[in-house]
């Protein structure tokens, strides 16, 4: 049995997602892990795929989640992820509270709970400020970097860095799928609302 910790960003996924991979083989059979194709600086390889390169071509979300994709392709990743389709679905904005609607505009790209004014800070936020830990919470994505690891709650701002880098909202299901490298032709089926996000957050980038 061989094992290694791999970062999805090193293989062209627009997400810094470290996971341990195990390969089991019969005796006498040599196995090896693939060499990284991308890197942070991109000196001897391709540069990490950024959030902007992954989702910037998507129009604003709609009520039914179906959107037309215009010819505004900004990257090779977008051309590939579209899978030759001119529309996609499940591009719906998750609901957020009135307090969160006030909080989100206060957080700049790369910012987090530390940018939230005291007048909007809940007891939890005040405690986070006091401890100074878990700096991805209430985070807004940077457009020129891969996202942080998507979790099963990437539809919430209180758990992780899930705020769109430009628009004042959380990530849509489709944006989450793109950051996991699922093509636009792929759709998620679930019997519960949260189940959609659980499936994508738990997935291994294909």
Please place each PLM-identified region on the residue numbering.
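Class I S-adenosyl-L-methionine
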Residues: 1-127
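C-terminal target-recognition/interaction regions appended to catalytic cores
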Residues: 75-206
């Amino acid at each position: 049995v061989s094992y290694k910790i791999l970062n999805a960003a090193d293989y062209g996924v627009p997400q810094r997602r470290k996971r341990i991979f195990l390969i089991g083989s019969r005796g006498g059979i040599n196995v090896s892990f693939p060499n990284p194709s991308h890197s942070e600086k991109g000196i001897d390889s391709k540069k990490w795929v950024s959030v902007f390169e992954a989702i910037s071509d998507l129009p604003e979300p709609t009520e039914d989640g179906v959107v037309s994709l215009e010819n505004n392709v900004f990257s090779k990743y977008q051309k590939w992820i579209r899978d030759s389709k001119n529309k996609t679905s499940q591009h719906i904005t998750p609901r957020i509270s009135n307090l969160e609607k006030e909080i989100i505009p206060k957080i700049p790209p790369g910012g987090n709970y530390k940018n939230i004014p005291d007048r909007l800070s809940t007891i939890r936020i005040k405690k986070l400020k006091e401890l100074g830990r878990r700096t991805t919470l209430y985070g807004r994505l940077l457009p020129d970097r891969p996202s942080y690891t998507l979790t099963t709650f990437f539809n919430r701002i209180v758990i992780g860095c899930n705020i769109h880098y430009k628009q004042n909202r959380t990530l849509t299901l489709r944006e989450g799928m793109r950051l996991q490298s699922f093509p636009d032709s792929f759709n998620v089926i679930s019997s519960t609302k949260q189940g959609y996000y659980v499936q994508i957050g738990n997935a291994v980038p294909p």
